[in-house]
Curated annotation (Swiss-Prot):
Induction comment from the UniProt entry of this chain: Ty1-PR3 is a weakly expressed element. Induced under amino acid starvation conditions by GCN4.
GO cellular component, one term: cytoplasm
Record note on quaternary structure: Homotrimer.
Residue segments, region Disordered: 1-93, 126-173, 352-440
Protein name: Transposon Ty1-PR3 Gag polyprotein
Note: Retrotransposons are mobile genetic entities that are able to replicate via an RNA intermediate and a reverse transcription step. In contrast to retroviruses, retrotransposons are non-infectious, lack an envelope and remain intracellular. Ty1 retrotransposons belong to the copia elements (pseudoviridae).
Notes on the domains: The C-terminal RNA-binding region of CA is sufficient for all its nucleocapsid-like chaperone activities.
Residue numbers carrying Phosphoserine: 416
Compositionally biased tracts (Low complexity): 153-165, 402-418
GO molecular function: RNA binding
Role this protein plays: Capsid protein (CA) is the structural component of the virus-like particle (VLP), forming the shell that encapsulates the retrotransposons dimeric RNA genome. The particles are assembled from trimer-clustered units and there are holes in the capsid shells that allow for the diffusion of macromolecules. CA also has nucleocapsid-like chaperone activity, promoting primer tRNA(i)-Met annealing to the multipartite primer-binding site (PBS), dimerization of Ty1 RNA and initiation of reverse transcription.
Length: 440
């Protein structure tokens, strides 16, 4: 009778089986919840005894057959959902299954290796024994991090600071789209810095500050695998992982290069939108600068067609080049090369005019100086002639006497007459001489 009650009311747990001693069904009208405490204790003892027999009985021992008793069979226990690797090592290539990555998209199915410098970051679960972050995992990328002010300062002190880890380090959000990967990797790098792993992050030249250890590489691989599901990775990331599924450092290095390229793209767009040209620099240098910017943007996936490029160039023209806005802006099929032909023509014309007119092209200040020098130069001419007069001419009375004698003596030689006429004649009114007839 006791065995029949055990078969009806005893619980089954964790691989232990309590089977009935008879194959006949026992029908009873007793309430299954109305069980005495003594019977419950007996059932628990029987269950404990069955568990102990399961663990102590070797696998090769023979179990006697009993037609009225079912032999206990150990139930297949699934592997722990959140437990780390037993050997504390990385997943092998066969376990990771790099071709299909069957476990990759399910963080709860991945064994997570603990890391001594950082806390564990498991998805929330009822049996987890590590710090949980239910409000952080899967949050949007725009959510600010509480430890945003804590940055990695000195990588050399990472070895001496093995035990002084922050109590709570916010993990990165879950990646939900390939387009969000550039923003996600920034938060992942911030997460590594807050976990005292800033020294292993590649710098601008692509090399880390210090060499990464095996444990750090394991931590890097597991965290990247958990928070970046494979279906949301960009194509270039999948290409890297298809060659080496643990090469997370190469992904970080390429991501930093792309960040720098994005910064260069932004600078090129700003430069192209704020172009200025007035002929002060050679047209060849201006053309080279603009074409290099357009080529870089086109190579990075930002396509600048001829119409947009010509509009941006013409908007920055000034001076004699400004009229190109109004002469060519209606040409729909104008190319950048055609626009620069016009710019070169104006620049060469400017250079030719400057080289051919260097002497008579004067400023207003030069003209003022020339006018002042002209008034002063006329006076020395007058002054230069006065000494010549005083030295070469006689007194006024002598010259007047010579004139009177020359008029009264017709027999004078022609040479003396011609000589006297060439000299300047000055008359004095005291001799009562008048040159104009009819004035006396």
């Amino acid at each position: 009778m006791e065995s029949q009650q055990l078969s009806n009311y005893s619980p089954i747990s964790h691989g232990s089986a309590c089977a009935s001693v008879t194959s006949k069904e026992v029908h009873t009208n007793q309430d299954p919840l109305d069980v005495s405490a003594s019977k419950t204790e007996e059932c628990e003892k029987a269950s404990t005894k069955a568990n102990s027999q399961q663990t102590t009985t070797p696998a090769s021992s023979a179990v006697p057959e009993n037609p009225h008793h079912a032999s206990p069979q150990p139930a297949s226990v699934p592997p722990p959902q959140n437990g780390p690797y037993p050997q504390q090592c990385m997943m092998t290539q066969n376990q990771a299954n790099p071709s299909g990555w069957s476990f990759y998209g399910h963080p709860s199915m991945i064994p997570y290796t603990p890391y001594q410098m950082s806390p564990m970051y498991f998805p929330p679960g009822p049996q987890s024994q590590f710090p949980q972050y239910p409000s952080s995992v899967g949050t949007p990328l725009s959510t600010p991090s509480p430890e945003s002010g804590n940055t990695f300062t000195d990588s050399s002190s990472a070895d001496s600071d093995m035990t002084s880890t922050k109590k709570y380090v916010r993990p990165p959000p879950m990646l939900t789209s390939p387009n969000d990967f550039p923003n996600w990797v920034k938060t992942y790098i911030k997460f590594l810095q807050n976990s005292n792993l800033g020294g292993i992050i590649p710098t601008v030249n692509g090399k880390p500050v210090r060499q990464i250890t095996d444990d750090e590489l394991t931590f890097l691989y597991n965290t990247f695998q958990i928070f970046a599901p494979s279906q949301f990775l960009p194509t270039w990331v999948k290409d890297i992982l298809s060659v080496d599924y643990t090469d997370i450092m190469k992904i970080l290095s390429k991501s930093i290069e792309k960040m720098q390229s994005d910064t260069q793209e932004a600078n090129d767009i700003v430069t192209l939108a704020n172009l200025q040209y007035n002929g002060s620099t050679p047209a060849d240098a201006f053309e080279t600068k603009v074409t290099n910017i357009i080529d870089r943007l086109n190579n990075n996936g930002i396509h600048i067609n001829n119409k947009v490029a010509c509009q941006l160039i013409m908007r920055g023209l000034s001076g004699e080049y400004k009229f190109l806005r109004y002469t060519r802006h209606r040409h729909l099929n104008m190319t950048v090369a055609e626009l620069f032909l016009d710019i070169h023509a104006i620049y060469e014309e400017q250079q030719g005019s400057r080289n051919s007119k260097p002497n008579y092209r004067r400023n207003l200040s030069d003209e003022k100086n020339d006018s002042r020098s002209y008034t002063n130069t006329t006076k020395p001419k007058v002054i230069a002639r006065n000494p010549q007069k005083t030295n070469n001419s006689k007194s006024k009375t002598a010259r007047a006497h010579n004139v009177s004698t020359s008029n009264n003596s017709p027999s004078t030689d022609n040479d003396s007459i011609s000589k006297s006429t060439t000299e300047p004649i000055q008359l004095n009114n005291k001799h009562d001489l008048h040159l104009r007839p009819g004035t006396y």
